[in-house]
């Protein structure tokens, strides 16, 4: 049993550890609204492609 098996052996079905960014697999700074499930860094990169636009 290696270190990774011990460290991540607990099942992650709910909570912050269960959600990952669909673009980069990061789990920090998640935007879950509207079912985006994307981290804030990737959102800034892909927002225009998704259809969001900045309002002045």
From Swiss-Prot:
- Binding of Zn(2+), residues: 21, 24, 39, 42
Keywords recorded for this protein, A-Z: Cytoplasm, Endoplasmic reticulum, Metal-binding, Ribonucleoprotein, Ribosomal protein, Zinc
Q: Which PROSITE patterns match?
A: RIBOSOMAL_S14
Q: How is the cofactor bound here?
A: Binds 1 zinc ion per subunit.
Cofactor(s) listed: Zn(2+)
Keyword check for Ribonucleoprotein: yes
Say yes or no: keyword Ribonucleoprotein present.
yes
Mind naming one GO cellular-component term on file for this protein? rough endoplasmic reticulum
Q: Out of the domains of life, which is the source?
A: Eukaryota
Q: What is the name attached to this protein's record?
A: Small ribosomal subunit protein uS14
Origin organism of this chain? Culex quinquefasciatus (Southern house mosquito)
The organism's lineage is: Eukaryota, Metazoa, Ecdysozoa, Arthropoda, Hexapoda
Per the record, the gene is RpS29
């Amino acid at each position: 049993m290696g270190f990774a098996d011990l460290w991540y052996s607990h099942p992650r079905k709910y909570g912050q550890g269960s959600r990952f960014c669909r673009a980069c697999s990061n789990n920090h700074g998640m935007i879950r609204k509207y079912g985006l499930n994307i981290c804030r860094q990737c959102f800034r990169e892909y927002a225009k492609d998704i259809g969001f636009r900045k309002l002045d």
